[in-house]
Regions:
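N-terminal mature ectodomain segment of secretory-pathway/periplasmic proteins
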Residues: 24-98, 133
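Flexible, processing/modification-adjacent segments and terminal tails
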Residues: 21-28, 91-158, 164-166, 175-176, ...
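Beta-strand-dense domains in secreted/periplasmic systems and polymorphic toxin scaffolds
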Residues: 72, 148-150, 171-172, 198-202
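Bacterial N-terminal signal peptides that target proteins for export
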Residues: 1-9
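A short, surface-exposed beta-strand/turn
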Residues: 60-69, 83-88, 158-171, 214-227
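A structural detector for short beta-strand units
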Residues: 57-61, 79-83, 156-160, 179-187, ...
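Bacterial N-terminal signal peptides
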Residues: 8-17
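Pepsin/retropepsin-fold aspartyl endopeptidases
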Residues: 53, 153, 161, 186-606
Length: 606
C-alpha cells in the first residue's frame, strides 16, 4: 500500500493546442459544482469505506473550506493510518501509529497545493490566486476532458481534468518526488446545494495498488474545529527505563539483533525503511500476514506486500508492544549471508520515531533512549533534518553545489547522486563518464556509473574525493526530482550520529582515521542469485575480469576454491577489493560448461 497521503497512477498524454482561457472552464465548473453554495459552506466531513492492498475498512475525511486544513483517517484492521494538515504543520501517522511532520522543501510546497485543493480553489474567484495554463482537450476511456494546470502561489502544480459534459472535476494529477499520482472523482451527488463525489479512486505510478473509497455520506459542518485536523497522539507502546546499548554488525550493511515475540533475529537498520519481516521470518513465528499490496525501493521494480502485527519487539532493554510489520519478499541478495542464517528483515522509521538513537559507527554500537524520558544530548555538529516521506533529509553540498541529501543507513555502499539534480546543475555529463556498474535494492537492479566526487559536505564536515554512483533510474528511490544524493555507510562510517526525529536534528560527531574501502579491483559486479552461485551482472571493458574472459551472465560457483554456497555477497565484495596484484581464482559456469579463470586485481578507480 502506498505510504502517501494521496495516491494514484497517472495517465500521461501529450497536450493538445490550447482551446480556451482557464477561467472560462472554471466558471463552468463553479456553476456545475454548486456555485454560490460553496461560499456559504465553512467545512465538510465525510465517512465511508475504503479498499486498498487487499484490505477493507473505514475511512473519514474532514475539510476546512476556509483555511485549507484537512485530515484523512483510515482503519484497515491490521493497522490504522492518517494524514493531514492542522494549519501549522503537515503531518503523517504511519501504520505503526508513529507521527512525524512532512516539512521538507517539496512538502511545504505540496502542502500549499493540498490546502488549495481542500478549499476547492478552482471554484473560487480568480482561482484563489493560482496561475493557470491554457486549456487543452484530452480523451480517455471514451470520455472527453478539459484539462488545465493550476499552480497555487508558492505551491506545486496540479493538473485538473474536468468532464467536458458535466464540467465537474473528474481527476487531479500531481507529480511527487519519485512518481505521478492521480485521484479520480466519480458518482457526484447533490448535498446541501453542493455536488460532491461519492467514489474516490486513487493510484500511484510507483505501485500497482488501487485505493478505492466509497463515501457513505458527506455532511456540511458549520464550525471547523481544530481537533478534526489535529494529528493523533502517538501510542504509548514503548518501555525503557533509562537507556540501552547494543552491538552492531557493520560490514556495509548496519545489522542489529532484535527479539520478535521472544525470538532473536538479525535485522538491517534502515533510516529509509520501515519495520519489515521476510515471509520466512513471519512463518517461523507462526504469523499469518494479511492483505495484498505492493512496495518498492531502490531500483525500478516492486515487491508484493502484506501486513502483520507482533506482540513484542525488543532491542536490548527497550521493548515495544503490539507492533505493525510489513511482510516483504526482500531480494535474495539483500538478506543472504552465505553459511549464516539469513537476515529476518528491516527495522526502520518506527524505531527512530520512538527513540533518541546514537549510532556509533567506529565503535559499532547503538544506544537507545526513550524520547521525552530524559534530555538527550546532541553531540557534534547539529544538522536540521526534514521529511518529504519517511527518510531524513538534510542540506549538504556535492562538489560545492548545494542540494538535499537523504541519510540512509540502509545504503550499504557509496553515495548515490540523483540524475535529475545532476542534470539540473551540469554535473551529469561528467558523472556518466564513470565506470559502468549496477546496484540492487528492494526494487531490483539500478544501473550506475561510478566515479569520485571532488567533495561532499554535511554540516560543515567535508569528505574529500569520496566514491559515488550516478543513477538515472526512471522509477524508484533513485529517480527523485527533489533530492541531490543518498548517503550510506561509506560516508556515515566517519561519524557518530546522534539522531532525534522529534527535535528534527542529527548530530554529526566526526571520528578521524577511517580508510574507506577501495573501488572494485576486479572489474566485475556479481550478485547472489541463489545459494549455489553468483551471477555476473557487469564486466568492465579492459578490466581484470574482461582479460580473464569473464562475461555477463556467467555464474560464479566458487572463489579461491570455496564454493559459492559458503560465501555471502559481502564476502565476495571483500575478495574483489584485495590489494592490487592479488590473484583471484574463480570457477565459472556458462550454460553447462564449467571453467577456471584467474583475475589479477588492478586499480580501477584511484
Amino acid at each position: 500500500m502506498s505510504h502517501r497521503g494521496w495516491a494514484a497512477a497517472a495517465l500521461v498524454i501529450s497536450m493538445a493546442p490550447a482551446l480556451a482561457a482557464g477561467s472560462d472552464v472554471l466558471t463552468q465548473a463553479r456553476s456545475a459544482a454548486g456555485g454560490a453554495a460553496w461560499e456559504r459552506t465553512p467545512a465538510l466531513a465525510a465517512q465511508g469505506r475504503i479498499t486498498a492492498s487487499g484490505l477493507s475498512g473505514t475511512w473519514s475525511r474532514a475539510d476546512d473550506l476556509q483555511r485549507g486544513r484537512w485530515a484523512v483517517r483510515q482503519d484497515l484492521g491490521v493497522f490504522r493510518s492518517a494524514n493531514g494538515d492542522d494549519g501549522q504543520r503537515r503531518w503523517r501517522q504511519d501504520a505503526s501509529g508513529g507521527v512525524h511532520a512532512l516539512n521538507g522543501a517539496y512538502s511545504l510546497r505540496a502542502a500549499i497545493t493540498e490546502a488549495w485543493l481542500t478549499r476547492r480553489g478552482w471554484l473560487r474567484a480568480d482561482a484563489a490566486s493560482a496561475s493557470l495554463s491554457p486549456i487543452a482537450q484530452r480523451s480517455d476511456e471514451g470520455h472527453d476532458f478539459d484539462v488545465l494546470r493550476a499552480t497555487p502561489r508558492g505551491g506545486e502544480p496540479v493538473e485538473l481534468w474536468f468532464d467536458a459534459r458535466s464540467h465537474l472535476l473528474a481527476r487531479s494529477v500531481r507529480e511527487l518526488p519519485i512518481s505521478l499520482q492521480t485521484v479520480r472523482y466519480a458518482d457526484y451527488r447533490r448535498v446541501g446545494g453542493l455536488q460532491l463525489p461519492f467514489r474516490i479512486e486513487t493510484r500511484d505510478s510507483s505501485s500497482s495498488d488501487v485505493e478505492t473509497v466509497q463515501v457513505d455520506g458527506w455532511r456540511i459542518e458549520r464550525h471547523a474545529g481544530a481537533p478534526a485536523y489535529a494529528a493523533p497522539t502517538p501510542p504509548d507502546d514503548t518501555l525503557l527505563q533509562a537507556e540501552t546499548t547494543v552491538p552492531l554488525e557493520i560490514d556495509g550493511m548496519v545489522v542489529v539483533q532484535a527479539r520478535v515475540n521472544g525470538r532473536a533475529f538479525d535485522f538491517i537498520l534502515d533510516t529509509g525503511g520501515h519495520n519489515i519481516l521476510t515471509p520466512d521470518a513471519a512463518r517461523s513465528l507462526g504469523l499469518q500476514p494479511v492483505g495484498a499490496g505492493a512496495s518498492g525501493g531502490a531500483g525500478e521494480g516492486s515487491l508484493s506486500e502484506q501486513y502483520v502485527r507482533v506482540e513484542q519487539l525488543q532491542i536490548g532493554d527497550a521493548s515495544m508492544r503490539d507492533q505493525h510489520f510489513y511482510v516483504l519478499p526482500l531480494q535474495y541478495g539483500t538478506v543472504e549471508r552465505g553459511e549464516r542464517v539469513p537476515l529476518a528483515g528491516i527495522l526502520g522509521l518506527e524505531i527512530f520515531e520512538r527513540f533518541f538513537v546514537r549510532l556509533d559507527y567506529p565503535a559499532k554500537t547503538m544506544t537507545l533512549r526513550k524520547l521525552g524520558h530524559t534530555e538527550a544530548r546532541i553531540a557534534g555538529t547539529p544538522v536540521p533534518i526534514r521529511f518529504d516521506d519517511d527518510m531524513p533529509l538534510l542540506d549538504g553540498r556535492i562538489d560545492g553545489v548545494p542540494g538535499v541529501i537523504a541519510l540512509d543507513t540502509g545504503n550499504s555502499g557509496t553515495t548515490v547522486v540523483q540524475g535529475v539534480w545532476a542534470r539540473r546543475h551540469g554535473l551529469a555529463e561528467r558523472l556518466k563518464q564513470g565506470i559502468e556498474t549496477v546496484s540492487y535494492g528492494a526494487g531490483g537492479a539500478s544501473p550506475n556509473w561510478a566515479s569520485r566526487l571532488q567533495s561532499l559536505e554535511i554540516g560543515g564536515h567535508v569528505i574529500e574525493r569520496p566514491l559515488a554512483r550516478y543513477a538515472e533510474d526512471r522509477a524508484g528511490a533513485f529517480s527523485s526530482r527533489t533530492e541531490a544524493a543518498n548517503i550510506g555507510t561509506d560516508i556515515l562510517a566517519n561519524f557518530v550520529l546522534h539522531i532525534d526525529y522529534r527535535a528534527g536534528v542529527i548530530g554529526f560527531e566526526r571520528r578521524p582515521g577511517l580508510s574507506a574501502p577501495p573501488f572494485n579491483r576486479a572489474g566485475l559486479r556479481a550478485y547472489k542469485e541463489s545459494a549455489e552461485s553468483f551471477r555476473v551482472a557487469v564486466v568492465t571493458p579492459d578490466s581484470p575480469a574482461a582479460r580473464a574472459g569473464v562475461s555477463r551472465d556467467d555464474r560464479i560457483i566458487a572463489v579461491d576454491g570455496v564454493p559459492a554456497a559458503r560465501l555471502s555477497g559481502r564476502q565476495l565484495f571483500d575478495k574483489l577489493i584485495q590489494p592490487v596484484g592479488s590473484e583471484l581464482h574463480v570457477t565459472l559456469k556458462r550454460g553447462a560448461e564449467e571453467r577456471q579463470a584467474t583475475l589479477r586485481l588492478a586499480e580501477m578507480l584511484p
